[in-house]
Amino acid sequence: FSGPKYNDYCMNYTIDLTSKIFPNCEIIVSTNDRNLASAVANNPLVNKLIISDNIGELPSLKYPENSSKIINNNINKQNVCCLKGVLAASHNIVLRIRTDQVLLNNNILKIWDLSKNFPSPLGRKGKIITSSIFSINPRYSERMPYHISDMLQFGYKDDIISYFSVPNYPFEYATWYERNPHIEYSNKLERTFRSKFAVEQWLTLHYIFNKEENFPIRFHNDFNDRIIDDFENNFIDYFIIAHPKDIGLRAPKFKDAESYYSTQCYSTFEVFKLLENKYPNTKITSTNFTAKGMNKKYFNKLMPIIYSPFAQFLIKRLSTENKNRIKRILNHLAK
C-alpha cells in the first residue's frame, strides 16, 4: 500500500482483508504521512513500514476552476513512496495499490493467469495489470494517448520497479501551458491542462519507450489516427487494463466517475479484444468478460451533444443536486 492516511476508515481493516484474500502475502505500507505510519505501526500483519520524506508537490496538473479545487501534481513524491515500497518487497509478484483502495476478492489472479498466454516485450517479464479508472481511450472526449491508470499495479516486481523508475517530472513541464499555447485543435477539456503531460502519460511513456526522446507524442493531446492505432497496438503488450468490477476493486473516491471510466476508458473486455485481434491464434477470447459502459453506438451520437458549448453552459448552471441527479442517471446507464 502506498499513499497518505484517509479519514474514510481505518486502514487496518483493509490490511486485515488483504491478508485473508491473499494468504501468506507480505504486507508493506510505504508512506510520507506520519499519521498513517502511526495508525498502522502496531499492526502485526504489516511486515514492513517504510516512511519517506515529503518532497512536496508541483503546481496543479490542470488550471483549477477556483481556488478551492486546486489539486497539486504529486507525481514526484508519489513515485518515491511507490518505488521504495516495491523495492522492499521480498516476493517476485507484487500488488501496488493506493491506501484508499482495496481488492475485495482475488479475481485479479485469474486475469494474471490469462495474461501469460500472450507474449511480453523484450526487457519485460510480463504484463502489468492496472485498472480502468482513468485509463483513457483517446477516441472519445479527452484525446490523450498513453494515459493509462497509475492507481494500481499487479505484476512482476522487476517490471513494476521499472514502471516507477522514471525521471522526476520537471517544474518547466508542470507549468508548460503557462508559456506555450495549446495546439489549435484542443477541445475545452484538453485546454484545462497546465502540464505538458499527464502523470499517467509520463509513467507509461517512460515504461514503454524508456527515454523521452523516443516518445511518439510531444504533449498531452498529441494525436491522430496513426498515433492512436499504434498506441493500442503497443500498450496491450505491456499492460492489461481491468475494469474494477472484474477484479473486485473498491475505489469509493471515484464512484461519481463510474459512468466516465466505464464508457470512455478501456475495460477488460476491450483490452482482451485488442489482444485477440493482434494474436488470433491464442485460445483466450474477449468473451471471458463483458462490455462495460454505455453502448458505444449510442454514446458516439450523444457525446457531441453532451460536450457541446451550449450543453456545458447549461450543466455548469445546474444546482449541485441536479448535477448529481445527472451523474446518477449516467452511472445507471453505464452499469
Label every PLM stretch briefly.
Residues 261-335:
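Membrane-proximal basic amphipathic "stem/tether" segments
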Residues 103-110, 115-269:
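Catalytic core and acceptor-binding pocket of nucleotide-sugar-dependent glycosyltransferases
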Residues 94:
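Short aromatic/hydrophobic "clamp" motif used to bind/position activated sugar donors
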Residues 1, 26-29:
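Hydrophobic targeting segments
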Residues 30-88:
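Active-site-proximal specificity loops/subdomain of glycosyltransferases
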Residues 97-99:
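Active-site acidic Asp-centered loop
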Residues 6-21:
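Short, well-formed alpha-helical segments that are part of the catalytic scaffolds
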Residues 6-10, 73-81, 195-199:
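Soluble or luminal CAZymes and related metallo-dependent hydrolases
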